[in-house]
Amino acid sequence: MKLLNNMNKDRFIKFQSSVENTWIKRMTWNGLYNNESWVTINVAKFLKEAKPFEGTMFSNINDFWKFINKIKIDYVKWCKDIEDLDDKEVEALQKFFIGCIGEYFFVTLFKEHNTLVINNKLYRFDYVCPRLDDEKDYGVDLTGVVSNSTENKSNECALQVKFWNPFNKDFQMTYDILSRVFTDAILNDFIDKNENENIFVCWLNDDKNISKALRHSPIWDYIIFIGKKELNDNINGKFPEFWNILIENLNNI
């Protein structure tokens, strides 16, 4: 356990030493076909040039998400001025944009408000960072160390970010999605497979919108959701202050 925790700390230190370059790379669209690198189609570059957040202020997570869902259209229009895109690429780019903002949102959240009450338990998140450049992506988006004060123990943790539409019931968390995350986390030594409660899913959808197969699967006991309720309970009162920090950081990537 100590070895794995140290590994997460070392990964976080490595991330901190190249935080700007890491985010620029993660926010660069690699193309839907042939894995070509389209450096010009970059979320960070769009935010600097279009300045969609200029003059904005939100007091809760729902209003923030509605705005993100709105400006994804502006992002695609901006991309179309640079590259010719077909319908599949447009849809993929919208999801890519929301995913980038979602990952950045949660990394910033765990840096500024690293203690959250989830299911009446107090958790502290440390060393949370995105995947490093040399790590293949099979499902885990963020990693870190989580401490459960109720049980007085610290575990390495894996987090998947699904920054999904809280107002759209069509998105469902399934066994296939979470089983890939669980397998990826274990095979890459992001978590200790013998410890419970070390896979977190960060999403904004309804907690009832989960497949029956997932609820009855063996991995269900390993999963903790950080969703609308948890975010509303923990940060809504501090959201204006958090929003200023988030936007300042995004504008300086």
Where are these regions (language model features)?
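Mixed-charge (Asp/Glu-Lys/Arg
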Residues: 1-253
